[in-house]
Amino acid sequence: MDNNLRYLQLLAKDYPNTMAVFKEIINLKAILALPKGTEYFISDLHGEHEAFIHMVRSASGVIHAKIEELYGRVLCEEERDSLAALIYNPQAEIARRKKSEEDMSVYYRNVIFRLIEVCRSVSTKYTRSKVRKRLPQYYDYIMDELLHADDEANRAYYYSEIINSVISLGIADTFISELADSISRLAVDHLHIIGDIFDRGAHPDDIMDFLIEFHDVDFQWGNHDVVWMGAAAGNIACIANVLRMNISYNNFDMLEIGYGINLRPLTTFAERFYGNDPCEYFKPKVFDENKYDPVGALTAARMNKAIAICQFKAEGQMIMAHPEYNMEERLLLDKIDYENGTIAIDGKTYELRDKNFPTIDPQNPYEFTEDEKDLLRRLRASFEQSEKLQRHIRFLFSHGALYKAYNNGCVPMTENGEFEEVTIFGKTLKGKELFDYLDEQVRAAYFTPENADGKEDATNLMWYLWLGSKSPLFGKDKMTTLE
């Protein structure tokens, strides 16, 4: 009886009477009878915003399959493809049709009927209430009426008048665009991003803007994500890695325009110390031209080299400060013979292709110069003060984790198939305990106040998660950037 009373008291917080409870039970049982909503698992976005957004809007072919199912014997292939294109990119397709259609009102009427049919088809897995929530605010009533039309003759005129009014009021373009967006939202019920929004692609910032507006999304962080999270938290090694990677892929629009990172200090520093250096081996790979912030190849190469040296110094300092990382083999600046221009790795000597290191003291190669310290302070401030970057990273924290119950990163294992023990900050952990602890430390790195105990160690750990051999996010033995 006591247990029943406790349950009843809990129910009473949300349901004032028995009828309210019965209503919810009926509702939940009915939902369980519906098919499971479509879940979309996608990984390794790597900043390729256009490809990713197209994949989500098209639901990886699900929408095209619905069109084939509905209109395969009714419309020609060209019309079916045009309808699909309208859903994927409504503004562009409408603009194209305006150049070729003699009477747009006829086109509008036809495609609205067709889009309603497609929308009705993709919404069959959901309750009417859930569908209504996915419809645009100002058109939800109209679309709801059209979606739940019947074949009664006395209602046909009513539905036809709705569409005629949309066209005559001059809002057909926006109505069609919103209807197309609704189809895309209904085609994918839940989106799982399994690692690496960021990397070499031109606009991870556009991907994040898109995902923030998406109705239901979660993240499993990848190592490219965590290095950005570490950079936003102010870790110098993470900042240097992020800048080096994106400069090397010519992503200046994203850095300076997208996130407002001030690269002027780095440009000035690079010209001062590498102004006579061709930096041949640091020239960027140009996959996408910058529209708003073009940077010359030589300037970019000098910036790339300047920040790469800062990266190697910052990483060396952290490796020496954290012997528990077991990354001593990545201490390479002290293995360089600066007089002869060679480096010793694993007992072998190699000649360096680039031998100009004006900011490295051979006697203390991991020490920053005063100019480098000033540069890195200014770059760190720019990352920490970027409103858009911090908003995106907070979204990654609020909607993401190191793992989820139905997927995981690279779990450290022994050769015998057992969970491998990993020592972090004096704690020896494995399996789920390791994941939970790392997840806790990543959150502490970002949200712990500056200069608080454990803040620096936690942010340093984010760098280790980017490239450490036992990192669940990396999954390899080593990162060979210098080589």
Where are these regions (language model features)?
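Feature recognizes metal-dependent phosphohydrolase scaffolds
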Residues: M1-E483
